[in-house]
């Protein structure tokens, strides 16, 4: 049986893929994405990296759409990152792997510095936080809106934590959508438009630099009001 999430993503797949490069400061049209998907690496008016990024994102969104495993864990998160980052980063040895303290991340235009710890510590941090979220998402006694809200709080956690050397925003966005699909939460989180990108990045940087529940909930409210499609409404 096709879920509401799968039906929505299936009908909007090309537009979703096109929007997914917005954090790289460009967005193609649905027609351009279709051309890239259909022709792969035949000569096109796009560079190698653009074509590879779009093909990766197309494959990653199909992975989210078709995901049918009985459980989601840290391996799912790493697999999704590998699909998205394959062949488009400057450190291929880190594609699909948590970064360590040897590879610090710098947030452009922000004073915030993501934690740099060993890979083992980073994985343990993820597992602790994600296991708590899974308890909430698996419960029959917690309202759906609370589960959606907590998933978006986890999205902020992933953005702030920057577990990978690159492609963190793309991986975080697809992963939270995979959660929406797997736990049948009847909603979909869009990437922002190019026109609204600066506003979103500004709000995100404010969350980075002012780490508090009020700031995080304000960003969650913004996401719900602007970029979340709720199929139950």
What are these regions (language model features)?
Residues 1-233:
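FIC/Doc superfamily catalytic core
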């Amino acid at each position: 049986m096709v879920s509401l999430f799968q039906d929505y993503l299936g009908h909007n797949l090309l537009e979703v893929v096109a929007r997914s490069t917005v954090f790289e400061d460009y967005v193609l049209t649905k027609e351009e994405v279709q051309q890239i998907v259909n022709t792969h690496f035949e000569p096109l008016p796009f560079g190698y990296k653009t074509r590879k990024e779009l093909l990766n994102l197309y494959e990653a969104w199909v992975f989210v759409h078709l995901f049918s495993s009985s459980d989601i864990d840290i391996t799912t998160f790493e697999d999704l990152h590998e699909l998205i980052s394959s062949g488009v980063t400057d450190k291929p040895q880190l594609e699909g792997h948590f970064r360590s303290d040897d590879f610090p991340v710098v947030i452009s235009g922000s004073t915030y510095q993501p934690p740099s710890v060993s890979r083992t510590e980073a994985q343990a941090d993820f597992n602790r936080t994600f296991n708590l979220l899974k308890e909430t998402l698996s419960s029959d006694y917690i309202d759906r809106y609370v589960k959606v809200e907590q998933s978006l709080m986890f999205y902020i956690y992933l953005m702030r934590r920057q577990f990978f050397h690159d492609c963190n925003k793309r991986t975080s966005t697809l992963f939270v959508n995979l959660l929406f699909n797997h736990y049948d939460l009847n909603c979909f989180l869009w990437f922002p438009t190019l026109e609204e990108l600066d506003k979103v990045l500004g709000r995100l940087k404010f969350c980075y630099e002012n780490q508090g529940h009020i700031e995080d909930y304000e960003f969650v409210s913004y996401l719900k009001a602007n970029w979340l499609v709720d199929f139950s409404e």
